[in-house]
């Protein structure tokens, strides 16, 4: 049984990128679907789709690589964990890695990237960082 589906999903994406796999399959949840939606919008993955196998839902993620075959994801890190939650206000999430990275925030408006959360004027739980 998996206690933290977000950490599991991030680890699967990170490991698939290191092994240069074309796709990886994640367990489905609404938060993970929103998370990979942000990754796709920001250009860190090619695409994703929700599939159903034996009455269980999964998310199939197609990874993205540069022209040299290197994963476009340099670092993917879980910040807020079940044993230690991390919350930040809107002013603390404005920029990450001088604008080259993204902070994914769970807010009252849903799961948002840091620039969207800043524009909406909301803070929240820092789920992960990616660059």
Curated annotation (Swiss-Prot):
Keywords: Ribonucleoprotein, Ribosomal protein, RNA-binding, rRNA-binding. InterPro entries: Ribosomal_uS8, Ribosomal_uS8_CS, Ribosomal_uS8_sf. One of its GO terms (biological process) is translation. One of its GO terms (molecular function) is structural constituent of ribosome. GO terms for cellular component: ribonucleoprotein complex; ribosome. Gene3D superfamilies: 3.30.1370.30, 3.30.1490.10. One of the primary rRNA binding proteins, it binds directly to 16S rRNA central domain where it helps coordinate assembly of the platform of the 30S subunit. Belongs to the universal ribosomal protein uS8 family. NCBIfam families: PRK00136.1 (NF001109). Part of the 30S ribosomal subunit. Contacts proteins S5 and S12. This is Small ribosomal subunit protein uS8.
